[in-house]
């Protein structure tokens, strides 16, 4: 697997770490290689969620506003194929999803002020969607601005292409604390990249479960489940109709929940306040039920989760003082989630250590991992 990481002191550079994720290997959990970029760490952030068929992996440093395309077809020798910053007047991309044609559709958070080449004060309230090929070349782009929602925060955070019904669901939430709070999602025509409508999410009364919608995922019944920063799960139905509907169907404890993963009819959610993850049963998607949870220890605020269908494992990274990556086992029949204690670094401790180690490129220091992608 490939873990995108950066120096916690922001003095070293962003790098891609290759870790043995094969449970049958004698070096399961060990570092195999690293590829270092020329980018001093700002904030390593999202990679793609799953490995693309092309083996050309997008990974972003959000503060730097720079995205790298790694060629990982030779998994033990990844290399930077190309990098880019702004495109079509938009900057600071966040999420990267593949289209049926193999291109990436990326959510760029910020739009430049007309004619200035610089962001508006406060980074603006809208951004853009940009289609990009594996060579980092612009294909097409469209603004998320909606004159009917002129006062709303419409900075795209993530997106979910639905080619089977020619729709695209986009969530609006900012990475910048100075910007207004997001409460909306958008439905687009995927083929024409045309905005069809902007809609508000369900607040859930006084629960504020709609605050800053982030990650949309396709549920097992075809509805869209959206995780929010305020730890809500919103369920959107009717996206192919003129009357889509959002309903808050679950609230996790705390706030700042991160990247969820759906496996079959289970949703795995990182929940920082418990220093762990919670699993929901989606058999009744209108009323998900918790079936298990796992605490990973103080010092880790889990954020990213990802699924490896080959090894049947969930990977977890986070922020905080515990700079470790963990692998979890998910029972796909019961939803029970447990720590994979067989996954350990050369130090013998459970998990992969990013703290105060000497890396193959000669750098010694501590790193924060963020996005993690499994090889095919």
Residue positions per predicted region:
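Beta-propeller domains
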Residues: 4-42, 47-82
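Beta-propeller fold detector
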Residues: 27-37, 79-86, 139-146, 195-202, ...
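Short, conserved, GDST-rich strand-edge loop motifs in beta-rich repeat architectures
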Residues: 2-10, 106-126, 170-184, 319-332
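Loop/turn-rich, solvent-exposed surfaces of beta-rich toroidal or solenoidal domains
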Residues: 253-332
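Short loop/turn segments immediately following beta-strands, especially the blade-tip
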Residues: 18-27, 69-78, 133-138, 187-196, ...
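Asp-box/WD-like beta-propeller blade repeats and closely related beta-sheet repeat scaffolds
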Residues: 72-163
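Blade-level signature of beta-propeller repeat domains, shared across WD40, Kelch, NHL, RCC1
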Residues: 312-313, 317-376
């Amino acid at each position: 697997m490939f873990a995108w990481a950066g120096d916690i002191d922001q003095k070293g550079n962003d790098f891609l770490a290759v870790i043995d994720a094969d449970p049958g290997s004698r070096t399961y959990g060990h570092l195999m290689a690293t590829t270092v970029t020329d980018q001093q760490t700002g904030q390593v952030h999202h990679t793609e969620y799953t490995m693309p068929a092309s083996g050309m992996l997008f990974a972003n440093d959000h503060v730097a506003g720079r995205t790298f395309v790694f060629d990982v077809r030779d998994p033990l020798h990844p290399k930077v194929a190309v990098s880019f910053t702004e495109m079509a007047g938009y900057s600071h991309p966040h999420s990267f999803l593949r289209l049926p044609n193999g291109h990436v559709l990326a959510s760029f958070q910020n739009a430049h002020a007309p004619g200035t080449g610089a962001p508006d004060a406060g980074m603006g309230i809208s951004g853009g969607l940009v289609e990009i090929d594996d060579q980092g070349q612009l294909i097409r782009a469209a603004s998320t601005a909606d004159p009917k929602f002129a006062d709303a925060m419409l900075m795209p955070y993530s997106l979910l292409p639905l080619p089977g019904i020619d729709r695209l669901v986009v969530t609006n939430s900012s990475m910048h604390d100075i910007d207004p709070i997001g409460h909306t999602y958008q439905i687009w025509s995927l083929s024409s990249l045309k905005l069809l409508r902007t809609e508000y999410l369900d607040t859930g009364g006084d629960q504020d479960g709609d605050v800053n919608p982030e990650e949309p995922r396709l549920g097992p019944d075809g509805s869209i489940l959206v995780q929010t920063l305020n730890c809500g799960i919103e369920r959107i139905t009717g996206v192919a109709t003129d009357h889509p509907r959002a309903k808050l169907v679950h609230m996790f404890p705390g706030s700042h929940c991160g990247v969820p993963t759906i496996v079959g009819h289970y949703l795995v959610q990182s929940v920082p306040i418990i220093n762990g993850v919670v699993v929901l049963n989606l058999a009744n998607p209108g009323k998900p039920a918790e079936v298990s949870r796992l605490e990973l220890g103080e010092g880790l605020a889990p954020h990213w989760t990802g699924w490896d269908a080959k090894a049947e494992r969930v990977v977890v990274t986070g922020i905080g003082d515990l700079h470790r990556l963990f692998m979890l086992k998910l029972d796909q029949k019961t939803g029970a989630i447990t720590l994979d204690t067989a996954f350990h670094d050369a130090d013998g401790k459970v998990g992969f250590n990013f703290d105060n180690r000497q890396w193959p490129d000669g750098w010694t220091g501590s790193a924060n991992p963020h996005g993690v992608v499994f090889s095919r």
